[in-house]
Amino acid sequence: MVNLRFEAVAEAFRKRPLDVAVPQERPSEYFAKKVFNRQKMYKYLPLDVYEKLTDVIDNGAQLDRSIADDVAHAMKQWAMENGVTHYTHWFQPLTEGTAEKHDAFVEHDGKGGLIEEFSGKLLAQQEPDASSFPNGGIRNTFEARGYSAWDPTSPVFIIDDTLCIPTIFISYTGEALDYKAPLLRSLHAVNVAATKVCHYFNKDVKKVTANLGWEQEYFLVDADIYSTRPDLMLTGRTLMGHDSAKNQQMDDHYFGTIPERVQAFMKDLEIQALELGIPCKTRHNEVAPGQFELAPIFEECNLAVDHNMVLMSLMKKVANKHGFRVLLHEKPFDGINGSGKHNNWSLTTDTGILLHRSGKTAEDNLRFVVFIVETLMAVYRHNGLLKASVMSATNDHRLGANEAPPAIISSFLGKQLTDLLDHIELADKKDLFTVSGKKGMKLGIPEIPELLIDNTDRNRTSPFAFTGNRFEFRAVGSEANCASAMIVLNAAVAEALTNFKQRVDALIAGGEDKTSAIIDVIREDIKTCKPIRFDGNGYSDEWKEEAKKRGLDSESSCPVCFDRYLDEDSVAMFELTNVMSHDELKARNEVKWETYTKKIQIEARVIGDLVMNHIVPIATHYQSQLAKNVQSMIDIFGREEGKLLTERNIKIIKEIAERTQLIESGVEELVNTRKVANRIEDAREKAIAYHDNIVPKMAAIRYQVDKLELVVSDELWTLPKYRELLFIR
């Protein structure tokens, strides 16, 4: 075991970049090669079936079960032509991963043989065991039935020899047990609410689509070195390890030259992702050593979420092929930046208008201001809930550190937009518009330059920043399912727009002009949501105090943050928008608390095992070597001179004794504290106990271990150090 670390390091240095077979076609030609997209639908489906299916996808029409057999037959034909032998209902349970059960395209032919079959019934619906997935008590073990149901708005795709069918996952009694079902409901809610508001400006708008562009950060670690770190293998992060002398302080990794092995991995990943219809656009080194980013072109929100889940799975497979392990944990290494997944969110009409982009006419700019302000209203009203949507045991390590957005949700708008909203709020109403004959009201809002997108500065400390034509939600964790944040954001914006329209309609019904009514409500909302606007340093202590004064949620305990899901305002918002019921919210919180507890529990067990089976034996072994050296020197030179010559060694012997004693007592305390916490039956209280009592004890043990790493002989230390984990690739 002593030499395993060095063998792993030597093996890592011997690795060379793999040759990647690049397709002869252009990327645009092999894009979505493994996706049953519209082109394939048109080719394989009867025209009337194709038109009915696209009506479902584009217009939300009810799926006609009569076409399911035709669609299933076409999918099977296309899939088998591409070497597919199995199919699966691919869904996203509350594990934050994906789930799938593969079935073959075979049935008895009645003659002792087999025949390839795939019916509309198998396409549309299956029955996984709902009790075996996180369900928050909705399903008991003896109440196993759940349903997965086809989502036709997200195209099926091929992974290896399996046809993957995106589905929702619900209980026998209809409650959502996944991320996709409430996401689809939230997208419907924001579509309906935004479309109604758009009709103030353009009656031709029939649909508003929420877009999402995610930016996936990750770390790559050599597979051999990774295999000698049990903490990385079992928890996704290093539970111990002293800083490397060189980490990110030189600012030389960000946008630096991509290492050759990593470049080969990225190339291979992009080719496979493009074949799966994921429109990869950007790749680069991130700030921390060993950290990288991949970002696609934005897509419709539901599809973007599916693509991110596919990509995270694909990354692991491709990394293994190239001799790496990909780390998606938000904070795999202490002392350097963690990983996030910025979610760029926007709304677009079916007439091609981006609702968060300024226009060329006064009416366009009024519409722009409406959607900006109502988005801010949503974030203001539900800032604590938005934070809860991105909180987890893993993201807890990243949020609030001076590397990521703070754990207080605020919005940065930039000087131009801030000045505009201040002008609308403070100016006399008569100065904001003028009457222009029979054309009605004409806004006198100062011109918003077309270069707004370039004139909007960046504030990396802002969790929810306006970046010219969209909002960037930066608090989402790298390992998270984007749907969690998008469900809350879409529902909150839908509620804000609905409330806005009700008030405007009331003023119009009272005889006020439409434009005047819109301005009245917008001015009121600008004042109301002003506390959410913050353009300063989100890391400062002054901001934390100011945020409390503004009434913003400043809670930093992850388990306590989950309470926001069951606040009266949150439940009312989810029920108003038909996104989730009170029972579904309650069940999800149970899952969140249980998941938090289990993750910390695993970490506590792993750190206890590592320190007692690796660190303490290594340290005491080195201590014994030093003691023998001291005794030998005394035997040769005499007690007085021998002690003088070995003064440094004696000091280290004492330090090792003190630190190992603290570690051993710390592990004993950790175990006893865990036993106390495990006796707590309430999921929320147990999670809080783990957060408040166990996490600090783990940190105290780590502190002693990291100090020992600096004094114990490098030759004896069995766990790869940060310099090896981060710089050998």
Predicted regions and their residues:
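Short linear, low-complexity motifs centered on an aromatic residue
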Residues: 96-113, 130-131, 229, 236-238, ...
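Histidine-centered catalytic micro-motifs
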Residues: 89-92, 341-345
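Flexible inter-domain linker/hinge segments
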Residues: 5-11, 20-42, 188, 192, ...
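C-terminal amphipathic alpha-helical interaction region
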Residues: 524-729
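Glycine-rich, acidic/polar active-site loops that bind/position phosphate-bearing ligands
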Residues: 143-328, 333, 337-340, 347-590
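Short, solvent-exposed linear motifs at loop/edge-of-secondary-structure regions
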Residues: 60-61, 66-96, 215-222, 462-481, ...
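N-terminal hydrophobic targeting/anchoring segments and the immediately downstream early-domain regions
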Residues: 1-24, 132, 141-157, 162
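Active-site core of metal-dependent hydrolases
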Residues: 30-142
